[in-house]
Amino acid sequence: MTRSPFRRLVFGTLRRLLYLWVRSETINQSSFTLNLDRSRPVFYVLQNPSLTDLAVVDTECTKAGLPRPVLPVSVGSLIEPAAFFYLTPDPDWLGRQDKRGAPPTLTRLVSALSQNAAEDAQIIPVSVFWGQSPDSENSPWKLLFADSWAVTGRLRRLLSIMILGRKTRVQFSAPIHLRELIEHNKGHERTVRMAQRILRVHFRNLKAAVIGPDISHRRNLVKGLLNQPLVKQAILDEAERENISPEKAKAQALRYGNEIASDYTYTAIRFLEVVLSWFWNKIYDGIKVNHIEGVQKVAQGHEVIYVPCHRSHIDYLLLSYLLFRNGLTPPHIAAGINLNMPVIGSLLRRGGAFFMRRTFKGNPLYTSVFNEYLHTLFTKGFPVEYFVEGGRSRTGRMLQPKTGMLAITLRSFLRSSRMPIVFVPVYIGYERVLEGRTYLGELRGASKKKESIFDIFKVIGALKQRFGQVAVNFGEPIKLAEFLDSEQPGWRQQELGPQFKPAWLNETTNRLGEKVAQHLNEAAAINPVNLVALALLSTTRLALDDRAMARVLDLYLALLRKVPYSPHTTLPEGDGRALIEHVKDMDLLSEQNDALGKILYLDEQNAVLMTYYRNNVLHIFALPALLASFFQSTSRMSREQILRYTRALYPYLQSELFIRWTLDELDAVIDQWLEAFVEQGLLRFEKDVYLRPAPSSRHFVLLTLLSKSIAQTLQRFYMTVSLLLNSGQNSISAEELEDLCTVMAQRLSILHGLNAPEFFDKSLFRHFIQTLLDLDVLRRDEAGKLSYHELLGELAEGAAKRVLPAEIRLSIRQVALHRSEDAADQVAPPVQND
């Protein structure tokens, strides 16, 4: 085709005509060009013969300044008329293809390189996608639309160009060095076959990652669920249990399948992309995506399960949009059945949502159908997304994982581990969450309202506000097989039973949930709003002068750069003053001028709302804040003392906030933080002792502000232990203690003017009590009453003296004592008068 000037002229004319309509872009171009050796000859390989694909590749190479595929290239003494070839050879004049034959260009290259050991050639697989969609229907009309696994001819390609040509994506993959294959010394023919096999596997895996694996259409998929052994048995059990015919039970199972299954279509995905592109540009100043390269790599050859944090109803829309824009298949998304409503539910279903009931209890047939549907998605390699937190976090904290979906995933993998599963944590960080106003009531302590898609319409009136930027950070993937190998060695050889529910399933699932939550927190995107909230909420009056505020923010940034929380955590750009201006522009920060300068403060509404953004990053500052707390009541501490008290308190902070470090790693991390404190002037180190600055110094003020960020958490811990100790051994249940703690916290928040609803959040007390039980600090007797270790009081008071001011400890003890006396009066017998 390119052997003569005439053919080059024809090709150039075709390319220009094609681009009167077609618009193309390259996926992940930067990571590809980094791996390219410009000093070595480059050959492009396309999977199937296509002049239009070649024209698109040639255009993208020209745009990127890469060698063009249609120009001659030399390898030693070999001169090839063009720098491309097709993995599947051109058809003969009857239209027949010999798919087993080797491309002549590849054969000549291997021969030339075998004769010249100094030469090499880079083979770059290139894929052109005319739209992205899984082949979810077999109707002739839909086969005309997007790239799929079906084999179709020139008519379909023509219509694909007409319909989807303006959404064409090109994927350049990492170069394959032919020299490395030749050095295996397999001989000419075996080397050619090896290269062909590598390329075939590569194209198959890439296609699955970009357009999704091959699945049957929805009706056949749902009907197929009913023919699986576990579902067939569940149908028979349902018929016997409900005293109905097997046909009626099967019809019910079919209704469940139709209620659950998604109806994934390219049309809906493309519609959502257009709408969401407008929406993001309308309300956000930008969307930053970090570390997606690792996902693009792991998506090939793995069943990917995205596990994002859940802060807003738009989380799943944002993630699907970004995956689609970055050349990855949007996942099938687990959605609550409350979202399956007219119009909205249909659109979500076509966008990949499958619906699940909030509880499966008492409905084994539904459970079986749902589990089988997920198992089908997993084993076919279709990406899936679900939220391990269950509902949206109204407080900004990472919620305790709901392990139901994780357990279903684990059981599916135990049933068939042929397709390796990898969990991809996704942290979504908002500078202003869209539902912020609707969260205000709950942040002030009102009861949680039932979730509804209509929540999103309540924010329409707030769209005139500035919402800043959104950061989407992809965390470190968790490979399920490796996790099971570490948690349950030999799991592959174990007898798992017909239901695939080994005795260790619940405990292992809980640990998997904790690991996912920790990896999510590791990927946190720290933004200016988080840091401003952290600083101002640590002050007594929620105010600082602008210079002091800038110093605090600069300190936080310096500490985080000195001791990075994790490689996946991201920091904002700019210094403290730039961060202040950014938050002021978003109307989250108020300003007052006087003769001495500017005062920055939070008004009443923003003060409550900013607790949400502070809580987003509390896990990152918990350990340094704890270390700073030690020096509020003492001027000097040895390293041994610091390590001792930190190790005593850390397990409870780690459990509540999902902090990443293990106890074995803790000492080294503490040393890093202490070194950073000394470097920033927050501490001095003299004669093996750490000394705090003078109380009147600027550095002591900074140290105190840092310590305040964790103060309320430590107060809750001390409050719980004080109530328990005052109640005595075996006299109160966990539920009663939880209720007492909640009431006491509400009272203390009024007495001390605390404006933080999570201070009296019952679930936090419940989790702390459970952690005490898990660590054997507490035990339950047969009646459910709690007993505690005899050293608990001494340890609690010793640690409390180090981290809590005397007036706070006294106030907590007084309220706890009065509460115990009131309880004693209620159970004491009445006094008999003669």
UniProtKB/Swiss-Prot annotation:
It comes from the Bacteria. PANTHER family: DIHYDROXYACETONE PHOSPHATE ACYLTRANSFERASE, GLYCEROL-3-PHOSPHATE ACYLTRANSFERASE. Coiled coil: none annotated. Signal peptide: none annotated. Keywords: Acyltransferase, Cell inner membrane, Cell membrane, Lipid biosynthesis, Lipid metabolism, Membrane, Phospholipid biosynthesis, Phospholipid metabolism, Transferase. The gene is plsB. SUPFAM superfamilies: Glycerol-3-phosphate (1)-acyltransferase. It is found in: Cell inner membrane. It comes from Pseudomonas fluorescens (strain Pf0-1). NCBIfam families: plsB (TIGR03703), PRK04974.1 (NF003441). This is Glycerol-3-phosphate acyltransferase. HAMAP family: Glyc3P_acyltrans (MF_00393). Pfam families: Acyltransferase, GPAT_C. Pathway: Phospholipid metabolism; CDP-diacylglycerol biosynthesis; CDP-diacylglycerol from sn-glycerol 3-phosphate: step 1/3. It catalyses: sn-glycerol 3-phosphate + an acyl-CoA = a 1-acyl-sn-glycero-3-phosphate + CoA.
